[in-house]
Design a protein with these regions (language model features):
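Intrinsically disordered, low-complexity segments enriched in polar/charged residues with Gly/Pro
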Residues: 22-24, 35-38, 62-64, 99-102, ...
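Conserved short histidine dyad/triad with adjacent acidic residue
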Residues: 31, 49-70, 89-92, 116-121, ...
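Short, solvent-exposed loop/turn positions at domain surfaces
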Residues: 46, 72, 109-112, 117
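Short beta-strand His + acidic residue motifs that chelate non-heme Fe in jelly-roll/DSBH
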Residues: 59-61, 68, 76, 85-86, ...
Length: 162
């Protein structure tokens, strides 16, 4: 996918990129790869690249406050491909079919906002449940956010885990 998108595969990416199926055993449908470029508690900011296969979903989740910091706020910018971001609000029934069947009955977030290359979408409120699904080509997404303490991460799917 990186080669198809003409994305440079640096030594840092080769060394530090991680790949997750969230313990669900269905990586092609529900999973992600990525790299944390920075996660600064002292300055309260975070930089992350998300790598998604075509139609792949990050499990629905929220970020709660912890002893180390406030709930995480985040924004997303597709750099290659496109994504469907799902969050709270009025449902967009015409786009619910983008959610993998294995997750469709488990998610709370039913408001979809498609994002094309270089459009930026945002979490609509702190602690809101949300997720994204890659478009048909897959997606490389830059995520901007406040400090991320993994202790505050909560999944709506009780089987999902890091």
């Amino acid at each position: 996918m990186f080669r198809r998108f003409h994305y440079p595969i640096s030594d840092t990416i080769k060394k530090d990129m991680w790949i997750l199926d969230f313990g669900l055993g269905d990586f092609a449908q529900v999973g992600m790869a990525g790299i944390f470029w920075l996660n600064r508690q002292d300055c309260n900011y975070f930089g992350h690249e998300i790598y998604l296969l075509p139609g792949q979903m990050i499990p629905e989740h929220s970020h709660l406050p912890t002893a180390k910091g406030a709930a995480k706020m985040e924004s997303w910018q597709p750099r290659r491909g496109m994504i469907f971001t799902f969050g709270e609000g009025d449902a967009t029934p015409e786009l619910l079919g983008k959610i993998p069947i294995s997750q469709r009955d488990l998610v709370k977030s039913r408001r979809c906002n498609p994002l094309e290359i270089d459009q930026v979408g945002h979490l609509n409120r702190l602690e809101a449940f949300h997720f994204m699904v890659a478009g048909p080509e897959g997606a490389l997404v830059t995520e901007y956010g406040t400090f991320h303490d993994m202790v505050g991460l909560r999944f709506s799917n009780p089987k999902a885990k890091l």
